[in-house]
Amino acid sequence: MSTTTHQTEFLSWKILPARLDAAQTAWYLGFEPHEIPMLIAANLLKPLGKPARNCTKYFATETLEQLRRDEKWLARASDAIAAYWRQRNARKRSAGGRNGDGSR
């Protein structure tokens, strides 16, 4: 089953489980799965319990429902993701020795 098929099936569920994994959380909130660690690092999402770095992270559906309806939180989350990529691209440019105009 492809990711798109899993996502479509998940989004068609009428009753969600009490906890969702990172991919399901991303689909539910309207983000990409690779953006969930960025939101955790920005302290905008908190996984259940105290999972180890390499463990599967789960999130409470009840909390996600509240965040999903919070326009201010969605704006902060979107800004955090944009800031992450802005910083990462700036590091990449500075490591490559390029100036802002693309010249060396």
Which residues make up each language-model segment?
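Polyanion-binding surface elements
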Residues: 2-39
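Short helix-start
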Residues: 18-23, 40-75
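Compositionally biased, low-complexity repeat tracts
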Residues: 26, 45, 96-98
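Intrinsically disordered, low-complexity N-terminal regions enriched in serine/proline/glycine
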Residues: 27, 57-58, 83
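Intrinsically disordered, low-complexity, compositionally biased regions/tails
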Residues: 34, 53, 100-104
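A short, Lys/Arg-enriched interface patch at domain edges and termini
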Residues: 61-104
